[in-house]
A protein has these predicted regions:
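A short glycine-rich, Lys/Arg-flanked "PGG" loop and its adjoining helix->strand segment in the class I
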Residues: 149-161
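A short SAM/SAH-binding and catalytic strip from SAM-dependent methyltransferases
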Residues: 131-146
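Conserved class I S-adenosyl-L-methionine
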Residues: 9, 19-69, 71-79
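Class I SAM-dependent methyltransferase SAM/SAH-binding core
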Residues: 80-123
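Conserved beta-strand signature within the Rossmann-like core of class I S-adenosyl-L-methionine
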Residues: 162-170
Length: 224
């Protein structure tokens, strides 16, 4: 079985779920990552290493992103850089941004040539733009509550005209609905291009509890 939250995702594996409590993005309010992170970066990556050793595909997100043939990618809420590292290994120009310094330490140790930034997605200004931005690992639903629109607007500002924002997250009652996410994206001048229920492009319908959404920036939109 391939990815939902990630390649090899098993919703019954509490150890794995503990690895996916979120990505902290702002410092003015409590957030789920700060409250719930229970593993180190090395332990987080070890989960995927065990799955890869067992023959599972743990690069579903990278495969999905690469399908759009970008040359540059922002790994937004990168954590240990698992997705960004794989994309960089495939020859893409990658920048990773996260607020978890411990997770970024692992990213820097494993891929020192990649540009890893300790920053808030809601306010960061990278002074450049990207062909694709990926937010994997449930980033959207583990942001500080109330910051979702600011994060999407700010990362969208870093997209090249015609570029894509790719986000995969669990649809959880009381958190972020797919309708609300689409509205946030629309307000950031992004149009829905594709939606799937897994990173392996299984078909989507409203009964699904996980979505991988692709929103595209209009070709005539201004750069970052």
């Amino acid at each position: 079985m391939h990815s939902r939250c990630f390649a090899g995702y098993d919703p019954g594996d509490e150890r794995t779920n503990n690895c996916l409590r979120g990505t902290r993005m702002t410092s003015d309010k409590p957030n789920r990552w700060l409250e719930n992170r229970s593993v180190s970066g090395d332990a987080y990556d070890a989960t995927y290493e065990r799955r890869a050793a067992a023959g599972e595909d743990v690069h579903g997100e990278a495969d999905f992103v690469e399908r759009f043939a970008p040359t540059s990618v922002l790994d937004a809420g990168c954590g240990t850089g698992r997705v960004g590292r794989e994309l960089a290994r495939r020859g893409l120009d990658v920048v990773g941004v996260d607020l978890d310094e411990a997770m970024l330490k692992t990213a820097r140790e494993k891929a020192p040539d990649v540009d890893w930034r300790l920053a808030d997605l809601a306010t960061v200004d990278l002074e450049r733009s990207f062909d694709a931005i990926v937010m994997a690992g449930n980033v959207m639903i583990f942001l500080t509550p109330g910051s979702e629109a600011a994060v999407v607007a700010n990362v969208a500002r870093h997209l090249e005209p015609g570029g894509v924002l790719i986000a995969g997250f669990q649809i959880t009652p009381g958190q972020l609905t797919i309708e609300r996410y689409d509205e946030i994206a629309r307000l950031a001048d992004l149009d829905l291009a594709e939606r799937w229920s897994t990173w392996d492009r299984d078909s989507w319908d409203a009964s699904n509890d996980y979505a991988v959404s692709v929103h595209r920036k209009a070709a005539g939109s201004p750069d970052a």
